[in-house]
Amino acid sequence: MSLNLGSLGMEDASFSFGGSYIMALDCGTTSVLATIVDEYGCIVAQARRSVKTSFPRPGWVEQDPTEVLASQIGVMMEVQFKSGIHSDRIAAIGISNQRETTVVWDRISGQPIYNAIVWQCRRTAPLIDELVEQGAEELVRSRTGLTLDPYFSASKVQWILDNVDGARESAAAGDLMFGTIDTWLIYNLTGGQVFATDYTNASRTALFNIHTLDWDDDLLALFDVPRSMMPEVRWSSGDYGRVASDIMTNMPPIMGVAGDQQASLFGHCCFHPGQTKNTYGTGCFMLMNTGDEIVESKNGLVSTIGIAADGKISYALEGSIFAAGSTMNWLRNNMGIISSVSESAQLAASINDNEGCYFVPAFAGLGAPWWDPRARGIVCGLTGASSRATIVRAACESMAYQSYDVLRAMEQDVGLSIERLSVDGGASRNEFIMQFQADLLDIPVLQCETVETTAIGAAYLAGLAVGYWEDLEELEQNAQIVRTFLPHMSAERREQNLAGWRDAVKRSLSNAQ
């Protein structure tokens, strides 16, 4: 197969795909990944590096953008070395990224003016409270599909402009650039040649109108962000320029970009309305494809752009859960209750039930469907007989309980029952959690062959753009389910468990009595 890259707005060239691969870059919250994918959607090689996160004050979460970039370039080099597959055999590159995380940098020097403010950061809660009091919530929801919450990028940009010396003046002079992590990577990987984001990442900023598919002037004014700072918005499957030659000698093209959860949706081949996936990563993120319909949630979910490829926008309902895998990290790193994350499944299964103990991991407040930035984490129901296994089991179960709340909210919003749930992410390999999830939801839970569905989705978007794969039907043929978890819990026990969870959540909310 060959393709004339001139049809993609690139220089005229003919590329043969024989013996070639797609490289996917997944820039996550806790690590960055480079993956080489073959024509069957199988992972040939991977390289991963951890990314440091700092917590300068309670509720504040930051990362160094230059370290993130260096780590991403590092794994790009490493995966080529490990596999023996170099840039002359890379047909295209796809990028997926942690969403909402905000970087502002100087247009002249290319240097960030502040650390990246991570999606989990809650420092802008007072700004959000002021906007809610001003009645801005309906404007934001009607234009963006999102709720007013510190989670999204808009208030993070505003905070940087208001709190970094000289930032307001530089922004007014047109000297600053804003981007989510994808934009930061694209700008630097292309040597400053491309300043762009894709529709899915733009839709997570609370500055982008998902109806007009453009930055919204009213929202930019609301958050006091100059339009000159904003990147160009492009299709998720399309041309984002070439990687600079000092990074990859043969300068492969970047042809796919999507926020990590939308990339996961694409990697699961959820191309049709009603298809739903849940990613168990640092947080949990459940998305349902709603096709060309923007479903306005009445149950604490957000509407967002799900897939933006082949000249077509497919929207999605999303429920974002802020603490999932990060809860296991907290048990290990902060409390010393477990020595490794993999130990959690064994400990959780070592006791017959949760012994009436519930863990609400509201370390960064609660996301969907509660949206309470001031909720606080709690463990309740402890007795003298409780052990570390009790707490670990309650922590594992919390992922499934939170996902249950989101899925039921989705069903209420669309008026349909979800018949199965596709899952990915690191915690999807925890058999205890997946079985408990199936038991709570009372539907089959389908475990994919790889936990790296996000990277696969990024690869698919890039490969489609250059003709490496012909169409969506070919991608669907690649999809492989390795295990199905079927529900076994009695209805009586299920309701008993859920009643205890609901009571625990009420205690964690900021308005708890």
Per-range role (PLM):
Residues 1-114, 142, 248-256, 441-445, ...:
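N-terminal glycine/serine-rich phosphate-binding loop of ATP-dependent small-molecule kinases
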Residues 5-17, 23-25, 125, 131-195, ...:
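Active-site core segments that coordinate phosphate-bearing ligands/cofactors
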Residues 39, 87-91, 115, 227-232, ...:
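Short acidic capping loops at alpha-helix termini that bridge into adjacent secondary structure
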Residues 46-52, 238, 362, 382:
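Generic beta-structure capping elements
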Residues 49-51, 235, 307, 487:
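Active-site donor-binding loop signature of nucleotide-sugar glycosyltransferases
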Residues 81-118, 147-153, 186-209, 234, ...:
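Short beta-strand-loop/turn "lid" adjacent to the catalytic site in phosphate-handling enzymes
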Residues 121:
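Carbohydrate-associated surface elements
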Residues 220-238:
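A conserved helix-loop-beta module that forms one wall/lid of the active-site cleft
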